[in-house]
A protein has these predicted regions:
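Asp-based, Mg2+/Mn2+-dependent phosphohydrolase catalytic module
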Residues: 1-7, 18, 43-46, 117, ...
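N-terminal helical cap/lid subdomain that shapes the substrate entry/recognition surface
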Residues: 2-126, 140
């Protein structure tokens, strides 16, 4: 096999630990609602419970479509769908305010795994190009703010969010987009992720090696076989070194 030259990481569940509890998701939408009604109190908005429910349904529909079609969408598109479900006509400034409220709610949303920064530093010293590929509807600047807070941004050569692309993982085009930006061939890349279908099958499909980071949250499909499996990111440098020397 070709010696690895670049490593591409998933974000949530791989580099960072992120809360996805229902109460946390509802809290974010309520923050969005409060920002909206605080700035535009006389616009005749529905009550907060209805807003949270409609936006949550729009978010669930987004992810369902991602799973079925490998589609992608933007933050503005998702909130617009939520307002449609509410039967509300929304102006551009109102939409922007609702988005800003959500963005404030997710500031500091995730915590890097304890070995994330150390592993990235080791891989950079070893000469690997490093990339990030995340399935998300969130705006790039929302994610980038958190990466900067934890000083992970300075260790990544390329960062790609599917909210900026027409497709989501496991669609081949998003993996090839990252390899193009890294200026390496897919066969020279290693994808590291915690989701078997999105990360592992997608990477294998374009000729990459694929390292599955164990995650008991998701059901593991038995028909997908990763190139290697790890429990902690700290296992990566040794694994990659073995591949380089083989």
């Amino acid at each position: 096999m070709v010696r690895p030259q670049a490593v591409i990481f998933d974000l949530g569940g791989t580099l960072v630990d992120s809360p996805w509890r229902q109460e946390e998701m509802d809290r974010r939408w309520m923050c969005s609602y409060r920002a909206l009604t605080g700035h535009y109190p006389d616009a005749g908005w529905p009550d907060g419970e209805a807003y949270v429910r409609a936006m949550g349904e729009a978010e669930a529909a987004h992810w369902q479509r991602v799973g079925q079609e490998q589609w992608s969408g933007s933050p503005a598109g998702l909130l617009s769908e939520g307002f449609r479900r509410l039967g509300c006509e929304v102006k551009e400034q109102e939409l922007s305010t609702a988005l800003d409220g959500y963005a404030q709610a997710i500031a500091g949303w995730a915590t890097p795994f304890s070995d994330a920064r150390k592993t990235l530093c080791e891989l950079r010293r070893a000469g690997y190009r490093l990339g990030l590929l995340s399935n998300t509807w969130w705006a790039a600047e929302w994610h980038n703010a958190d990466l900067a807070t934890h000083r992970l941004d300075e260790l990544l050569d390329v960062v790609v969010y599917t909210s900026d692309l027409p497709h989501s993982k496991p669609h081949a085009s998003v993996f090839l987009e990252v390899t193009t930006r890294l200026n390496v061939e897919p066969e020279s890349c290693v994808m590291v992720g915690d989701m078997m279908i999105d990360d592992i099958s997608g990477a294998l499909g374009v000729g990459m090696r694929a390292v599955w980071k164990r995650n008991t949250r998701w059901i593991r499909p038995t028909h997908i076989v990763p190139t290697a499996t790890i429990t902690h990111l700290g296992e990566l440098p040794r694994l990659l070194s073995q591949w380089r020397e083989s």
